Amino acid sequence: MRQDVANMFNQNAPAPSFEAIRISIASPEKIRSWSSGEIKKPETINYRTFKPERDGLFCARIFGPTKDYECLCGKYKRIKYRGIVCEKCGVEVTLARVRRERMGHIDLAAPVAHIWFLKSLPSRISTLVDMPLKDVERVLYFESYVVIEPGLTELEPLQLLTEEEYMDAQDRLGEDAFTALIGAEAIREILKSLDLPTLAETLREELRESSSELKTKKYSKRLKVVDSFIQSKAKPEWMILTVVPVIPPDLRPLVPLDGGRFATSDLNDLYRRVINRNNRLKRLMELRAPDIIIRNEKRMLQESVDALFDNGRRGRTITGTNKRPLKSISDMLKGKQGRFRQNLLGKRVDYSGRSVIVVGPNLKLHECGLPKKMALELFKPFIYARLDAKGLAGTVKAAKKLVEKEKPEVWDILDEVIREHPVLLNRAPTLHRLGIQAFEPKLIEGKAIQLHPLVCAAFNADFDGDQMAVHVPLSLEAQLECRVLMMSTNNILSPANGKPIIVPSQDIILGLYYLSLDRKGEIGEGMVFADLAEIEHALDAGLVSLHSKVRALYDGVDSDGKPERRIIDTTPGRYMVANILPRSKAIGPELVNTVLSKKAIGKIIDEVYRLCGQKATVIFCDKMMELGFREACKAGISFGKDDMVIPEAKKRLVDATKDLVSDYERQYADGLITRGEKYNKVVDAWSSCTDKVADAMMESAAKMQVSRGKEQVNSIFMMADSGARGSKNQMKQLAGMRGLMAKPSGEIIETPIISNFKEGLTVLEYFNSTHGARKGLADTALKTANSGYLTRRLVDVAQDCIINEDDCGTEKGIDINAVMEGADVVVSLNERILGRVIAEDIKGPDGKLVVPANTYVDEDVAALIDTATVDRVKVRSPLTCETKNGICAQCYGRDLARGTLVNRGEAVGVIAAQSIGEPGTQLTMRTFHIGGAAQVADQSSLEASFEGTVRFTDAEIVTRKDKTIVVVGRRMQVEIVDADGRTRQSFRPAYGTRLMAKDGDKVMPGKLLADWDPFAQPIVSEVAGEARFIDLSEGTTVREETDEATGISARVVVDPRSTSKTADLKPSIQIVDASGKPVKLPNGSPATYVLSVGAILSVSDGDRIEPGDTLSRVATGGAKTKDITGGLPRVAELFEARRPKDHAIIAEVDGRVEYGRDYKNKRKVTIVPTEEGREPIDYLVPKGKHLAVQDGDFIKRGEYLMDGNPAPQDILSTLGVEALANYLTDEVQKVYRLQGVPINDKHIEVIVRQMLQKVEITDGGDTVFITGEHIDAIEFDEANEAIRKSRKKDQREATANPLLLGITKASLQTRSFISAASFQETTRVLTEAAIQGKIDTLDGLKENVIVGRLIPAGTGGGIRQFRRVAAERDLKLKAKRAAAMAKAEEGINLVSLPAPERDTAE
């Protein structure tokens, strides 16, 4: 009894536990079974008594009482009458809460189509009945009749008849000869008459036989819908409603405002319309009204139900009183303000405060300063409880009074409450997980929150008025998670790249940098000191300076961990820094015996963390911060205008460049170069001049300056060099020259800004520089929104990527090598494999095993691999992981934020998305490089960086008369090999490059290897002979273009005006011998060089040609016309897998190139495969584009026919998954590297994995799949596995190609419909899911947040696993018990039963 009473008051009964959610179409019976009664009247409440009207939209009889345990007429009040139905008003006496749960229904007088299935594209109704959507609408909205049963007449089934045609047919053929209906009834009849299993069979037959692509598409689309209905056991006629459900009244409330007016949910208006029209239709039908009136009423009913479900989807939007469109049920779910994103994913949190932040340099790393007033408010409940426990207040009211009066004992209790109770601090926008961290509060006076300076980088906070929010974790579990997982001391490394994120910046760096400088000839040089106190004494006495080279005794630890004292060479400043290092055998004072810039300090913290652990690191960081601030303050570094030193060399350099530019102008005037080439050369000259001036400036700034008889380091140089503030680029603009600027369109303006800010800009220069500045401001505003949207899409696509097992056992992996740009190593192999797991044994050059497979690469293993001189390593990768749901720990490798192998349950998908999205705001929005000041400096030559021997591979070269070598192939590789046979440097010379070294030459570093014209692509003759022009005739294919500025003419190949005569013209140059026969090339084809449109001829008809002579050249437009989509748009383009505008054409097979005929503005290029029995492949190339290959060239699979950015889909289809992953990783990394943002490759790999989850069926075999269907790779593998296991004869497996989906598409096609619906296109996703009867197994994070559970990652994953085990154990026990009972009942001797356990699964 007592339990019952307790249950009665405990309104939060345990929620039913469930494993999955299914969505399907509701049948009319189902809708009626949910309902508690039919709503017959459109009235809501009585406006006098405020009581709901009977049978109306708020009827208490149907939906339940408005007050707890009280019927409407007031006959039964109190809980004792619970469950009684009042005989007077018919209301059940129960909780008013049931008004949120009970549904009603409206019985429609005529069936209506559900607008989601009708208008959500592709329309499911029209697909099933096999009529165009327009026709279906004409039938539904009573414009045409549709023939359902033609009988013996000449009418076709599903033929549309207008009113007149229908009447006419009835007159002609008799009324009963055929059946034709109109409206939703007609469509319902057609859907009802469908026999789905037979239809599916027929469609499968037709699919097998169909030859045309269009039909195949149509059949497979229809078959998909039919299959969905068969699978989900739904009947197609349920898409036509005969009953409309009414949602509970408390979910569409009516609220009285003051002044006798009411605020109501729009849904009530929409329901009212439906009921009004429905009742009117019923009345008209009873009155036997004329057909036309009834039809109009039915159409209006259809429209009102449409508006209720999705207002504005079809026809006019229904508006309310103030011309505002009414919010329909669909609008309640859609968009940022919809149910999903507003209430289910974005909940507000209780117990929080926010205030401005100020710096707290005296805090420890794990502390934050919390204003007393704020703490008092936040911790109120705890204070009340403590006051009560101490007997200082008997009731809550008394406690409240005490707190309000702020009595002294209240403050004491607040101190107790706060001790060891962490709080969460959050700064918006929270772009990555470090945007929320836990701290222990320290009570402070004042009203601002104090923040530790070192965590600013993680929060991206500064103290110019930023605000932060404080949240209080209430439950014990929450406090535990805060302390163990979210404490700022546990987040030392950044999850994006594994480097420390608690790195000092600005003043601290400047102080440490100043401390660590050393100079010759300072006062007190060579002195010896015993300890720190002695040094400080000497410094105070002025006997020694911070930068003097001295020797001192250092108390360290030897290799066995015993304390030892030794003398070290140092400076007083560096000794201070060494003194705060943790004492450990792995770390000595040598670590800080260098100039401490930001990078160096980051490295030191990293080392300390790895070798001495977390606690030592935190203590070290705090000490370092204190030391840095103190010394920066003491040093008193400041700068004035004289610190900006303009280099003497500037005038000389600028004058020299001016001469060079006027020289180019002269060449242009003489017609030696084209306008584009001149532009390129000028821009090039100025950008190298700017760099030289900058170098000269840095050199002069780095020198000591003598001021007031003392040598001083330049303060600005110190700030920039240490990384405290400013950069070389900014210094260049202050004291060098500002350099080239860009127009808003992205082109570079030829005239640079020669002045710097110290000299001041001229009016014209200032005007030129405003472009960049203005564009920068406009960009910043757009950037934030774009970057946020990219992050959202990334999180959405990767949210269900969780570490679910320890090892999937795969042997696959991807190859990794160092990233090179030209001859420079940008990212070493060492850095790239750190924290990965090796996939196959690594052997050294001598074949000895260096590292076995499945080794986890930590710093030591990486160093080992580095010494073994291997240049590529195969590592496990998320891309090749074979775990079913999620990724395994071995394939993922190191958890970057902890520096150890990743734990199970880590949400690596979200971490990847945040790591890529968080720096998004730092990327540019530009389609060109760096801000206003443009940088071009196109390489035009290459020098050797190492000593070694030159080696040519795939050499295709000709030697000219002057003994220079010209490259005439596209696959040639030039390498420099050292004495051990290791390749130290390699590059692919472009076609037309001049090589300065021969195969086998010995070279020294700095030797010029090659040079080329970066601004023109030449065509070079490989043989000697005479030039003969083919189809090159003045006026049709060649035009003399006279330059207005110079009067010099050049002959340019133009596109002939297309007429039948000129259609087959192929402008080309042939090399012929003395007898007039074409000379043969080495590969046996005649020496004919086809010219593309825009080529400038360099020879005349009949000229004598030597090998290596340039026949023509194509200017490659302004500084790189290849649209450099940079920054954010490029990252988005890559992740969305969009085809670039002028994408490269990739050869799909090895073969010989043949030029085909020309079409209007395309040219046909064919590759004839070398493989036997393969069909030649044709490509259509735009005419004006320069082709990378000549007629007759041999091309390998994956090489480019036409240059440009390749389309990722092409890479996937020709070169496979690994090549695609490498391409995407490299391209994304290029964008981030340009901004100096380090991101680990594995994050990009996780996202790419999510983009590659689907396959496209190429042949269904004997599975249920349809050709052309997109399905999950996992489902595909399972289906094939089933066929393999069935072992039936001649059963074929399905085949498929991997499919690359952009992140938006991939999110919308995830297995979880709840997650997809909450992302975008809510209605479409739900419609699709309902038809398929989809089941959401709640695997991802989003789905679980939406249904209100713990997420299956981190601690939530552990609890989930625990519950699962418990439930399985319970089931076994129950089964055991049941078996024992059964045995007992049979009369066999009774077995002792296991004691009943409590159901632990709940």
Swiss-Prot record:
CC per GO annotation: DNA-directed RNA polymerase complex
Cofactor(s) the record lists: Mg(2+); Zn(2+)
Enzyme class: transferase
Binding residues for Zn(2+) 2: 808, 881, 888, 891
Domain of life per record: Bacteria
Catalysed reactions listed for this entry: RNA(n) + a ribonucleoside 5'-triphosphate = RNA(n+1) + diphosphate
Gene Ontology process terms (BP): DNA-templated transcription
Protein's UniProt name: DNA-directed RNA polymerase subunit beta'
